[in-house]
C-alpha cells in the first residue's frame, strides 16, 4: 500500500510504544514484555529503581493489574527525536482494594531504547492524587487522548532549547514558570502548590525534540509552609522527584506539564 500523500513515515520508536500501550498495558499481558523490553530493563520512579524486566518490573506491573483489574492507559501526548521518547499519559480504573472506588491520574515517562527494545524509563505518576480519590475524594476526569499518538513524527534535537531548560532547572527557576502545570493542575489551568523552595537539583535525564524538552530531576529544597504536605514539617529539607515535558519558544517556556512524587515525599515525612 502506498503512503498517503503528505503523510510522514511512522517512527519505529512510536510503533514500539503502540505495542507497549495496546498489547501489553491495556491487555495486561506481561507475555509481551520480552518482545519489547531487554532483560535488564529498568524503571526509575521516585526513590525506587526496579532493575530487571523479569525479576523486578513484571512482578510490580502484575501487582498493579491485580489491584486495578480493568486498568486503562490513555495516551495524552508523545514526543520523540527517534532515539528518545517521552509519553504523557493517564491511567484510570477501579481499585478492588478500595471497594471498587474509581480514580484517574496522570503520568510522564521518559523512555530509552536500543533501536529494537526498551532499556529504561524515568517515570512519575500522580499517586498522591490517586490516593486522595480512592480514600473518598471525587474521581478526577480523564484528560483528552492525543488525537493521533501513533502518527507522532520524530523531530530533531534542539540543543538551544535543552540548554535553556537545563538552566531553569539548575537555577531553581523551573518551579516559578506559570506555564508549567504539575499533577492535576491542568484541570483548573492555574499553577498551584509548588511544594518546595528549590536549592539544588540532580538531572537524571533530559532530551529535546523540536521545540519540546523532557526531563526528570530529583530536586532538593525546603518544604514550603503553604504546601499541602507541610504540616509540622515546614522548612524541612526534602527531596522531590519530578518528570516533565515543556515547550520552548524564543527562550521562553510557553507550555509545560509535570508530575511529582508527592506521595513518596508524604510517606517519607511521616517516617521522619
Regions found by a protein language model. Name each.
Residues 1-272:
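C-terminal and inter-domain tail/linker signature
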